[in-house]
Amino acid sequence: AAVRDRARAEKEGPWKSPSLEGLVEEWAVGDVTEPDFAKDLAKGAAQVVSALGVTRQKADPWQIDNLANRAILASALRHGAASFTYVNVLGGEACPAKLTRAKTAFARALKRAGVVSQIVNPSAYFSDMMSVLKMAKRGKVHIFDPAIRLNPIHGADLAVCICDLMEKGEKGSWDVGGPDVFTWDELARTALAAMEKQPRVGKIPTWILPPALGLTSLFSRRLADAARFATWNMLHDCVGSATGVRHLADFYAENRGLV
């Protein structure tokens, strides 16, 4: 496993995400943007999986989501890996955010590479939906379009899906999501019910987005791009093939005490 911080990887993560302690045969600790570190990452690996990407870090998505993944792909090709599985994002080619442009650029490069390419596009993650539960704790959830649909997936279910695809060894691209499809209104009410609050859902007018994103970009282009990515997904259906056995309502119930 290639990580920046082994100690962090061996601790339980947010929302009870599991530690990797005792599960990794060999650690590679370093900076994936450094060519000397990346060139031999895939040495001895029969298959490569990359979920590498910018989340809340201050790094440039183009450097990480595209170029660093290309360096890992080059290592996989150099050392003869049989397949390369990439965790992308559903709808990335249509989303205007810099983050998704970087992901799309790498996904296209992977498809052209001389390796069995497997591109997995999750709709959203349960962990992403904790922001809705935090709003629900305050008694009201604010959304844009109540009819837009999504089916978030638990990270463990996504991992099972990826392992199944690796075992099959087929080349392709798959849009995946969890077993439950929600409208945003239904998701908001699920969060409010988990927090034992009255079903108070407010609608944010979409006309506010251009000036709000423009104002945010004056102070932080990174935050503006993250907001552009998040709001785009809230305004477009993000529904993948139903996968897994874990349900968001149960996840909310298990983690309500952590918000």
Task: Please annotate each region the language model reported.
Residues A2-R4, A51, V87, V120:
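The conserved SAM/SAH-binding core of class I Rossmann-like methyltransferase domains
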Residues R4-A9, P14, P35, R56, ...:
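Oxidoreductase cofactor-interface core, primarily capturing Rossmann-like NAD(P)-dependent enzymes
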Residues A7-A71, S75-R78:
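NAD(P)H-binding glycine-rich loop region in Rossmannoid oxidoreductase-like domains
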Residues K39, L73, G155-C163, V245-A253:
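Short, amphipathic alpha-helical "lid/cap" segments that border enzyme active or binding sites
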Residues A45, N69, K103, V132, ...:
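A general structural signal for well-ordered alpha-helical segments in protein cores
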Residues A46-V49, A82-Y86, Q118:
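Conserved catalytic-site loops of classical short-chain dehydrogenases/reductases
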Residues E186-D237:
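Terminal hydrophobic/aromatic helix or amphipathic segment near a protein terminus
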Residues W232-V259:
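Amphipathic terminal alpha-helices
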